[in-house]
């Protein structure tokens, strides 16, 4: 399963089907579940978040150099899904990347309390733009925030997929995850009859 919100269901299935291996992305309950067929996995997304923050910081510097904003108004907005460790570590990495390029930058975070709500993500982005954020990033799963950014002409950094089709004039980059190495490793372990790491 590839979403945080699926973990309780995967735990139930793992208990019901002990001869099947279950792997759940982004969760945290496998180790304490007592189920030998339940596994959690994640990637080093903080690295991609940091690099996308560097890109955002470079864009802020460009906007400062062009006179569109000042160092004092280099404010970034971040649309987060939930105030969970995964989201907080993600926006922290992103902001460290931003500040590596634009030390005067500040950041405001708003949460949707949903992993995927186009309307809430769009509303959060619009609210951040109204709060004078000049660049928006996200840890949420729809194109809501980039849609708001494109309409307002505000640069944005996406998540999971390229947002260029949604925001062709404002999307800078997206932090994305390559799950393939884990899937290959877990599948090979099942085929070989070895433990899944």
Locate the predicted segments by residue.
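A residue-level marker of the well-folded mature domains of exported/periplasmic proteins
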Residues: 1-197
